[in-house]
């Protein structure tokens, strides 16, 4: 999507006009204009010259946004320059409005004294009012220039309504002044007094001043809606210390190149994304992720621009600079989202497109109607002017975008990034949340969970033997034991004669004693295991854990259980989702036994096990038949499923925010951000409904009241000045209501409402249904040597790499691989594929 700056827009009608003319340019497939940020996003093959020309022809100005230095210049582009200008206009207008109101209303209504030269000087009074009004009209000439220019281009906007209303009041008052002068010359005092009461100079001036007041309040409030985006842009560091030719030098952060070596002292901001070469420190990443707890960084870890080095000295290499940094990607994502439209905005857009012409028509009908009813020209004109100045298309046009902008800002502060307004709206409507297990519900890294020493063996003795043996292994489960040993500060000699028996276990010698470790089958070859120990191992396996047995000189030392543990916040997050009326499903490639154990611990409604990475998309498609689906994954192998879902949520993106497949990017690896994102979406949607209700209600009530429809019944009539006051406050109320979203606590469950749903989800075997569609032929392989889920994954990946294999269901517990074939394949090929991975195939049928 190519981005443009658009200037000259003053209201929702202008926005609708720009969208309409650009959408008609050949080659444009979609266009979205934001009145808040004065920007436009265009997709298609049309040239920028054609697009700019179309905007210019419509009476506005457009230019292609400069891509360079977007983060540093963006804050300046969003700076509120409009409010100071409007405030100056307002103050000067008030200075001249006060004497005008004194002359027109103070003397006539409350008999306040007049200057001597105006006593009994009716013409002088009229000329003074005309002079003050002209000055105020000149001060606020922008309304007339914009309004009548738009009218000439057949695209009337809010300024057109104001300009027409003020011009009508001023024009009729000027006519009355000249008519009064003629009457005074003729000595007709009665007619003079009659025309004196037909002056509406103060109405014209008051309309312009009150609308300027409203515009000032609106501009100030709109400026606040972009505070979050501006604060992000202001985070961009200005300077960097780099090492070039062996010399340290200070340069602009914009000049840092990929591969440069840069230094960061304690208390300084990191200028660009990089990788730590030397040093250790705690980094405050709150600005990017919303995480208040500093993150420890050491050699080999990634660091991001705009995060703060809190303690140690760091030497880093620049890996992503300029627009490629994490900060720039976040800014781009939030900006792009602000330039898109939510589906709910379509109603307001349609109304805004015809609103002003409709109001002008109603005003004309009102004037003619009252004249036909026998009322005076002044009375009829006052009703028509009231209709013009009370009508407000801006309230309609701002109802959705201001809420979207503020909502996006709240999300960004909390590390929740919505790519489009559509995703921000749709997230709150989901019925089903599908969670990928690994890296989403769990940490994605095996950890030691249980230590069960054998009788007479201390926990320390078991751990030291396991640590010494596993230090030599490259297996993922071995790494879990080694990490645990490091945490306990174990220092043991390296084993001799180390040997890894693929798929079974490990052997080695330490102090002339033989150490063995591995699965039950491997250990049982050399010693007998009691039934009690076997039952303990079975219980661990039932809980989704992998039991590792260790022995010394054929004497059992005990069991260490390893598992990909559930994140601390996962059960609570899932509980919150269910409390919101959302059905929670877990997808995993694990066997059903392990999957159910994890699912029960996490508290999900359903578990769909044995789902291949490329099978997730079909599962999401099937779930989509039952309701709106959000898919949550870590982005690894999840792209098709994230794309298929109504809302794709990438969790734990960290520095990699450019997740093309996802609609929502969560910067942290916390599942709690999923209900928070849905809560934010619901809050924004509720706020939009409030804004739209107010905008429609205001115009539905205000226009008939201004037209005088209640005069015959209740005698209520609206002075044009009060109509202008109401108009000036309407947009301000909408924007202020949207700003309340800044007070929304997206972590609190107090205001959660359970979504009403009648979805009957029978999902346990939904993956099997999908698989049966391609089930031409299966073969069952008996395999020895598999001892954990990682072994399963290795065999599965190897088999599924064969072009003839559609899918493979592998179980280390059963020692089998059920292979679904798309076409015939020789058993020898299947056997060799598995044995090349150091496992033994004992049969195929």
Where do the PLM segments sit?
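Transmembrane helix-loop-helix hairpins at the membrane interface
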Residues: 85-239, 350, 715-720, 726, ...
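Flexible metal-binding regulatory segments at protein termini and peripheral loops
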Residues: 1-124, 222, 231, 247-248, ...
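Conserved catalytic phosphorylation-site environment of P-type ATPases
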Residues: 288, 347, 382, 395-469, ...
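Conserved cytosolic catalytic loops of P-type ATPases
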Residues: 26-49, 198-199, 230-324, 422-466, ...
């Amino acid at each position: 999507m190519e981005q443009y700056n658009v200037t000259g827009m003053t209201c929702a009608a202008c926005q609708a006009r720009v969208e309409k003319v650009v959408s008609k340019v050949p080659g444009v497939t979609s266009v979205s204009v934001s009145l808040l940020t004065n920007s436009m996003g265009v997709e298609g093959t049309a040239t920028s010259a054609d697009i700019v020309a179309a905007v210019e022809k419509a009476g506005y100005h457009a230019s292609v946004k400069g891509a360079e230095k977007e983060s540093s210049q963006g804050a300046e582009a969003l700076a509120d320059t409009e409010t100071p200008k409007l405030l100056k206009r307002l103050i000067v207008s008030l200075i001249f409005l006060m004497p005008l109101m004194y002359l027109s209303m103070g003397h006539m209504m409350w008999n306040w004294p007049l200057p001597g030269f105006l006593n009994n000087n009716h013409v002088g009074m009229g000329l003074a009012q005309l002079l003050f009004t002209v000055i105020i009209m000149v001060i606020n000439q922008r309304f007339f220039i914009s309004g009548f220019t738009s009218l000439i281009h057949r695209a009337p906007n809010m300024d057109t309504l104001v300009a027409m209303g003020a011009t009508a009041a001023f024009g009729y008052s000027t006519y009355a002044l000249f008519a009064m002068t003629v009457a005074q010359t003729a000595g007709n005092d009665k007619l003079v007094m009659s025309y004196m009461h037909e002056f509406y100079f103060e109405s014209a001036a008051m309309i312009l001043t009150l609308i300027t007041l409203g515009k000032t309040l609106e501009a100030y409030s709109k400026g606040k809606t972009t505070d979050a985006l501006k604060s992000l842009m202001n985070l961009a560091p200005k300077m960097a210390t780099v090492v070039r030719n062996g010399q340290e030098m200070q340069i602009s952060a914009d000049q840092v190149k990929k591969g440069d070596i840069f230094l960061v002292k304690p208390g300084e901001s990191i200028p660009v994304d990089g990788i730590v070469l030397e040093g250790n420190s705690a980094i405050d990443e709150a600005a990017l992720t919303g995480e208040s707890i500093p993150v420890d960084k050491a050699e080999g870890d990634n660091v991001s621009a705009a995060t703060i080095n809190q303690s140690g000295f760091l030497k880093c290499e620049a890996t992503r600079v300029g627009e490629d940094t994490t900060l720039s990607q976040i800014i781009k994502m939030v900006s792009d989202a602000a330039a898109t439209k939510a589906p709910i905005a379509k109603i307001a857009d349609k109304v805004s497109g015809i609103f002003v012409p409709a109001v002008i028509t109603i005003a004309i009908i009102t004037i003619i109607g009252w004249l036909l009813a026998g009322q005076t020209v002044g009375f009829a004109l006052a009703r028509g002017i009231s209709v013009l100045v009370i009508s407000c298309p801006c309230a309609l046009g701002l109802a959705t975008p201001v809420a979207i902008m503020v909502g996006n800002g709240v999300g960004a502060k909390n590390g929740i990034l919505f790519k489009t307004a559509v995703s921000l709206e749709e997230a709150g409507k989901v019925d089903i949340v599908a969670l990928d297990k690994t890296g989403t519900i769990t940490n994605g890294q095996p950890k030691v969970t249980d230590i069960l020493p054998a009788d007479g063996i201390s926990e320390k003795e078991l751990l030291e033997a396991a640590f010494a043996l596993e230090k030599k292994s490259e297996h993922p489960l071995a790494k879990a034991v080694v990490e645990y040993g490091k945490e306990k500060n174990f220092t043991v000699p390296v084993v001799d004669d180390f040997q890894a028996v693929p798929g079974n276990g490990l052997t080695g010698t330490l102090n002339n004693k033989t150490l063995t470790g591995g699965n039950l089958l491997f250990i049982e070859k050399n010693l007998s295991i009691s039934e009690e120990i076997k039952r303990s191992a079975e219980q661990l396996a039932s809980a989704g854990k992998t039991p590792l047995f260790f022995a010394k000189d054929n004497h059992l030392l005990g069991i260490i259980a390893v598992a990909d543990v559930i994140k601390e916040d996962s059960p609570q997050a899932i509980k919150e989702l269910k409390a919101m009326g959302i059905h929670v499903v877990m997808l995993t490639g694990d066997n059903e036994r392990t999957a159910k154990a994890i699912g029960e611990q996490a508290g999900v409604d359903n578990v769909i096990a044995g789902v291949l990475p490329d099978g997730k998309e079909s599962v999401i498609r099937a779930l989509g038949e039952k309701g709106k689906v959000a898919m949550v994954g870590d982005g690894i192998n999840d792209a098709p499923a994230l794309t298929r879902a109504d809302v794709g949520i990438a969790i734990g993106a960290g520095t990699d925010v450019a997740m093309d497949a996802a609609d929502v990017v969560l910067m942290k690896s916390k599942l709690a951000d999923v209900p928070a994102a849905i809560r934010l979406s619901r809050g924004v949607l509720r706020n939009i409904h409030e804004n739209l209700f107010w905008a429609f209600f205001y115009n539905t009530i205000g226009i008939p009241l201004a037209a005088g429809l209640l005069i015959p019944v209740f005698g209520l009539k609206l002075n044009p000045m009060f109509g202008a006051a109401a108009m000036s406050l309407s947009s301000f109320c909408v924007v202020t209501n949207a700003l309340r979203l800044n007070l929304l606590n997206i972590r609190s469950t107090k205001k959660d409402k359970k979504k009403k749903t009648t979805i009957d989800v029978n999902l346990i075997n939904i993956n099997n249904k999908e698989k049966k569609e391609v089930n031409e032929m299966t073969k069952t392989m008996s395999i020895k040597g598999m001892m954990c889920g990682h072994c399963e994954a290795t065999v599965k990946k190897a088999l599924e790499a064969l072009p003839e294999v559609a899918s493979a269901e592998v179980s280390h517990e059963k020692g089998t691989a059920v292979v679904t074939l798309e076409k015939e394949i020789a058993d020898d090929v299947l056997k060799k594929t598995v044995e090349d991975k150091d496992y033994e195939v004992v049969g195929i049928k």
